[in-house]
């Protein structure tokens, strides 16, 4: 009986020692907002606020059309929170999530910015600081975000970020 108790105690101590020496790794995950796309009636207000902000900060506006039901839209949001992408977004863009409901809401905004929602969501459009359309997705490029790498989002953001303002020190701007 003493032998069994001794072996049990030795096993517990050995497991405790192993656990203490096992390196731990931490994984940082970006929480996905359940309501990524605000109430559909808020889109016009958010767009007007973005236009004001962009005009004063000289940022571009990134319109993200989608719905809270859309898994690929949530993947895009995770990619937006990738440190490299988040830095570009925060410093160069004003992001507006446009809730399209179940392809039946805010269709006038999508039409105004030439975004063919029938090609799928998420769908993106880029406006300059004055609200002029610079780019709209025509072929559902981000419709299958689950198959796209975060680097593709980085490439897109870099392609459409505004030019850096000319410094007064630079002669040939």
Language-model-derived ranges and their functions:
Residues 19-21:
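Bacterial signal peptide processing site
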Residues 1-8:
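Bacterial N-terminal signal peptides that target proteins for export
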Residues 65-80:
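Conserved redox-active cysteine motifs that mediate thiol-disulfide chemistry
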Residues 101-121, 127-130:
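Structural alpha/beta surface segment adjacent to cysteine/selenocysteine redox centers
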Residues 78, 82-107:
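Thiol-based oxidoreductase modules, predominantly thioredoxin-like and allied folds used
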Residues 119-166:
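Non-catalytic, surface beta->alpha helical segment in thiol-disulfide oxidoreductase systems
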Residues 39-61:
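A short beta-strand-turn-helix
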Residues 15-17:
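C-terminal motif of bacterial Sec signal peptides marking the signal peptidase cleavage site
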């Amino acid at each position: 009986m003493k032998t069994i108790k001794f072996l049990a105690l030795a096993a517990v101590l050995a497991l405790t020692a192993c656990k203490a020496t096992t390196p731990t790794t931490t994984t940082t995950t970006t929480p996905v907002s359940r309501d990524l796309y605000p109430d559909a009636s808020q889109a016009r207000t958010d767009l007007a606020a973005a236009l004001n902000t962009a005009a004063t900060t000289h940022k571009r506006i990134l319109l993200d059309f989608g719905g809270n039901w859309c898994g690929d839209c949530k993947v895009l949001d995770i990619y937006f929170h990738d440190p490299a992408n988040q830095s570009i977004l925060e410093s160069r863009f004003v992001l507006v999530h446009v809730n399209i409901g179940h392809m039946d809401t805010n269709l006038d905004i999508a039409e105004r910015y030439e975004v063919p929602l029938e090609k799928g969501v998420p769908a993106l459009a880029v406006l300059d600081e004055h609200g002029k359309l610079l780019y709209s997705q025509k072929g559902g490029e981000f419709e299958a975000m689950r198959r796209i790498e975060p680097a593709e989002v980085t490439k897109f953001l870099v392609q459409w970020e505004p030019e850096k303002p000319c410094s007064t020190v630079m002669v040939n701007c």
